[in-house]
């Protein structure tokens, strides 16, 4: 069966049906809007990326997006979330620079620039889902951005790490997958990066293709870059919350895109 935006829209409408929800399929923009009729809050889904995931994962891709939307809508329907008293549940999350900088209510989200490809947003963990922290939440509780930043960084460092190692063509790859929603966020833990940098025999390259994986690679020969690039693209295409297929090199505490450095690296005769 060939999946189209119309077919996908119909499937999602059926799976997400609720007495208080409305759906709006926009054929020109290839989007589906899911909205709570009482609060007028909702989520707009970009359908082509979901179709791409469906071609790889079939029904599993549908299950993932239904779960994500259901949890997010439930959170929206609940009472206003407060940060005070829940400080240990505030974490940084990595998103692409194309990710919206405002909430569905047009409230500016709190974020910091990270790289040319990524931003750091801040989230209040609600268990099965989370709420991105916005400017209104800060003002209501009289929090500063610096307090959010420091609290999130402290909590991130307290998270346990789950790492799997693989060796391909003489290059070593380390996959951080604790499946706690903050695997990609561990790119912000400099202690981890510095430890792997210290023990790397080659260049330390890093990839955050989607929210639920961080890849560190000890690149010991030129083929390692291509292998990491292929891995990153595969993870990027299959992720529920994709970030970037681009990889970075880590040197002197800084991240730089691999393709920029490759262009500037002189070729040997």
Swiss-Prot record:
Domain of life according to the entry: Bacteria
InterPro entries for this protein: DUF1444 (IPR010838)
Family matches, as Pfam families: DUF1444
Coiled coil ranges: none
Family the UniProt entry places it in: Belongs to the UPF0354 family.
Protein name in UniProt: UPF0354 protein YtpQ
């Amino acid at each position: 069966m060939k999946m189209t935006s119309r077919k996908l829209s119909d499937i999602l409408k059926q799976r997400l049906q609720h007495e208080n929800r409305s759906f709006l399929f926009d054929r020109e923009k290839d989007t589906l809007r899911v909205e709570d009729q009482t609060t007028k809050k909702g989520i707009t889904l970009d359908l082509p990326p979901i179709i791409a995931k469906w071609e790889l994962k079939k029904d599993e891709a549908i299950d993932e997006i239904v779960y994500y939307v259901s949890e997010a809508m439930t959170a929206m329907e609940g009472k206003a979330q407060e940060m005070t008293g829940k400080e240990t549940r505030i974490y940084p999350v990595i998103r692409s620079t194309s990710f919206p900088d405002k909430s569905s209510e047009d409230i500016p989200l709190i974020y910091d620039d990270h790289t040319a490809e990524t931003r750091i947003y801040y989230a209040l963990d609600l268990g099965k889902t989370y709420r991105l922290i916005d400017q209104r939440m800060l003002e209501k509780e009289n929090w500063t951005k610096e307090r959010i930043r420091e609290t999130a960084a402290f909590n991130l460092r307290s998270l346990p790490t789950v790492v799997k190692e693989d060796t391909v063509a003489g290059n070593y790859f380390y996959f951080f997958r604790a499946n706690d929603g903050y695997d990609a966020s561990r790119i912000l833990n400099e202690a981890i990066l510095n430890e792997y940098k210290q023990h790397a025999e080659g260049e330390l390259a890093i990839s955050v293709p989607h929210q639920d994986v961080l890849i560190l690679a000890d690149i010991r020969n030129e083929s390692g870059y291509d292998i990491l690039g292929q891995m990153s693209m595969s993870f990027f295409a299959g992720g529920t919350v994709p970030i970037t297929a681009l990889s970075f090199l880590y040197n002197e505490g800084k991240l730089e895109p691999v393709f920029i450095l490759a262009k500037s690296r002189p070729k040997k005769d």
